[in-house]
Amino acid sequence: MSNEFGTVSIEPEVVSTYAGSVAVECFGIVGMAAVNVKDGLVKLLKKDYLHHGISVSITDNKITLDFHVIISYGVNIEAVADNLIHTVKYKVESFTGMQIEKINIFVEGVRVID
């Protein structure tokens, strides 16, 4: 982003950290998942590492987000994904001033919540 005073550069990790904190507040999202590609293992990330479950690409001030999530057992996946997309889109666009071009959601696991 540029204006008459200079340029503002936002690192992808800043966007992923913010998007992760927004995502875990959404209904049905238990947390973000770290996928070990070599072993095919999925593990639930602790709050300090949420950004590891999100891939961010910024091109021409447009953001693409890939979420790897773990959802609650018994929820409607489509409803959870729709809520996640709309909530993250609104909050990240407000936070960064950039447009969200695409949000991809990968459901990596299901957890039973007590």
Task: Place the predicted regions along the sequence by residue.
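Contiguous, often N-terminal, cationic amphipathic patches that form binding interfaces
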Residues: M1-Y73, D82, S94, Q99-D114
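Solvent-exposed, non-transmembrane alpha-helical starts
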Residues: I77-A79
